[in-house]
Amino acid sequence: MKKEKADKAQEKETDQRKQAIDAALGQIEKQFGKGSIMRLGADTRMAEMNVVSTGSLDLDIALGIGGFPSGRIVEIYGPESSGKTTLTLSAIAETQKKGGIAAFIDAEHALDPSYAKKLGVNVDDLLVAQPDNGEEALEICESLVRSNAIDLIVIDSVAALVPKAEIEGDMGDSHMGLQARLMSQALRKLTGTISKSNTTVIFINQIRMKIGVMFGSPETTTGGNALKFYASIRLDIRRIETLKEKEEPVGNRVRVKVVKNKCAPPFRQAEFDIMYANGINRESSLIDLAVRHDLVAKAGSWYSYGGEKIGQGKEQVKNFFLENPDIAFKIENQVRDLNSLPLMDQSKIQTREVKSIERDPKETKETKSKQPVSFSTEAEVDIAVGE
C-alpha cells in the first residue's frame, strides 16, 4: 500500500516537472524563435555530423570521422612549403565532387589557378576573394557563411589578415595585439553562424618562434589564442621527406598530427605523399593502408594481393592500381569498412590511362621490366620509378 502511494507521488512529481519544462521551452521559443532550444535527439542537424573528405584516406581515418566536420572551424598550421594550401585545395576538390560550393579567401594573394586545376579543383566554380585587409577578409567570410549556401570556406592565411590600422600606419609603428583582438572579435561573431549554416571554415596558419623559451617548444601560431579555442580540429602538418626521381625532387612526404579534435580522439597521425604535379597521391596512401591492414602482403620489396604478386617496389604497385581501378576500389572499400568510414560508390571510380614509353627495339623483355613506367593524369605525365 505504501509502495503504491510512493509510486503515485513520484509519478505526479514527474508529470509536474514535465509540464514545467514544456512551459519553459514554450516561453523560450516564443521569446527567441522556434528551434532556439530543443532536445538533442530531435535535432537531426546536431545528431548527424556531415563531413568533407580531406582528399587523403589516411588523414580521413586519423580524424576519426572521415574528414573535416561541417559547421565547425578547422586550423591547419605548419612550416613553409609543408602542404597546407595543397591540403585545403584537395578538400575543395572533394567538396566540388559532391556538388558543394567552396570559397577561397586569398589574403596572401598567392593562389595559383593552374596548380589548383591540377589538384582537381573546378576553378570556374570556385569563389575567390583577395581582400586588402583583415577586416575585409573576415567580413567577406561572415557574409558567405550567413548566405547558408557555401559548404567550405578556406582562409589563407591568418598571418596575412593584417588589420586596417596597421596597413594605413607607417612602417615601424607598434600595433601590439591588434591582430589577436581582431581574430578574437571575429571568431566570437562567426562561431554561432558557422554552426547554424553547416559551413566548414578552414584557417591556414603560419608558425612563429617565441623568444627566450628555455623549456618546451618555442613554436607558436599567429593571431593570438582565440583560434586555438574556437577550432574544433587543429592539424600540424610537416614535411618529413623529399621524394626524388632520378635525383630530381618530384614531391614531399608529409606527416599530419591531429593536435586537437573535438569530434574524435586526438593525437593520431597520418602520413601521405604530395606530388608537385598532381597533389596528394591516393595510390601511395592506399598501398600504405592496405599493408597496415594486412590486405596487401609485403615481403622485401615485393607486394602481393590475393596470393599473387602485383609489383616490386611501390611505384610498380601504384601503376598496378592505376591500371586496375576495380581492385583499387575494392581494397579502398575494405580499408574504409575496417575503419568505420562510409563506402565509396562504384560509379565514382576514376580511371587513368597508362601510356607506354618508347623503347629501344634492342631491349630485351628483362631489360624492359626494369624500365620506368609512365602514367598520365589530367594535368601532366609523371614518371614513376621502381624502388
Swiss-Prot record:
PROSITE patterns: RECA_1, RECA_2, RECA_3. SMART domains: AAA. Keywords: ATP-binding, Cytoplasm, DNA damage, DNA recombination, DNA repair, DNA-binding, Nucleotide-binding, SOS response. The keyword Nucleotide-binding applies. Residues 350-369 have a biased composition (Basic and acidic residues). InterPro entries: AAA+_ATPase, DNA_recomb/repair_RecA, DNA_recomb/repair_RecA_CS, P-loop_NTPase, RecA-like_C, RecA-like_N, RecA_ATP-bd, RecA_C_sf. Its main location: cytoplasm. One of its GO terms (biological process) is DNA recombination. Residues 350-387 are annotated as: Disordered. It comes from the Bacteria. One of its GO terms (cellular component) is cytosol. Pfam families: RecA (PF00154), RecA_C (PF21096). GO terms for molecular function: ATP binding; ATP hydrolysis activity; ATP-dependent DNA damage sensor activity; damaged DNA binding; single-stranded DNA binding. ATP binds at G78, P79, E80, S81, S82, G83, K84, T85. It is found in: Cytoplasm. Belongs to the RecA family. Can catalyze the hydrolysis of ATP in the presence of single-stranded DNA, the ATP-dependent uptake of single-stranded DNA by duplex DNA, and the ATP-dependent hybridization of homologous single-stranded DNAs. It interacts with LexA causing its activation and leading to its autocatalytic cleavage. PANTHER family: MITOCHONDRIAL DNA REPAIR PROTEIN RECA HOMOLOG-RELATED, RECA. This is Protein RecA. It comes from Leptospira meyeri. The gene is recA.
